[in-house]
Amino acid sequence: MPVQLRFKTGLTGADYVTREAWREARLLHCPVHPRGGCGFARHGTYARKSPAGTLIARWYCPQGHRTFSLLPDHLAARFPGTLSEIERVVATVEQASSLEAAADALRSDPVTLASAVRWVRRRVVPVRGLLTVLVGLLPQFFLGCAPTICALCARLSCERVLMSSRELAQVHLQALSPPLGFGHPQYAGGERNPRLQQHMGTDPPPHPA
């Protein structure tokens, strides 16, 4: 599994694709061997299914046998799609009478309600955990705030709290769980990370540039 790192772009998904911003991504040295000598080099790109046309720049360390990728802020980590799309799902559940009602309202494809509920739950469960962690991790921003999308958006006076939180919690991203952070999937299923908590999502397989 590639190690994901933050690529601060300030771009929307459409702008990222239009500008081919992955070409602007830079990783000046190996995160594992900052002094060099490991053969660290750019290693093409891999594609994300959504938004269409999205490519992610990556690098490879031969000595460490590790691949590193720079994930732009608008994309969800180890989940398909964008942070905004996942945030919309969670916000819909917060406002709905039940998770089933939210899933029924959100489903657009001809899938069963049970499948839609599973799809929604896979997004809601990790994000609810993340929001609770963020409130405790960043008291300077969220002290006394309820761990909900609505409450955190109101506190930050923003429309997209997950993208904003990736900026605020940038020094913790390797410990925070997906879809916000880049935590290792070995802590999937709600197990406790030595630093925070991890949860595994899904990510498309890498493809050559």
Task: Identify the residue ranges that each predicted region occupies.
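Short, conserved DNA-binding cores of transcription-related domains
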Residues: M1-H74
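Long C-terminal interaction/binding lobes of large macromolecular proteins
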Residues: M1-L11, T132-A209
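Proline-rich intrinsically disordered, low-complexity coils
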Residues: P2, L27, P31-P34, P51, ...
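Short, positively charged, Gly/Tyr-enriched micro-motifs
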Residues: H65-S157, A169
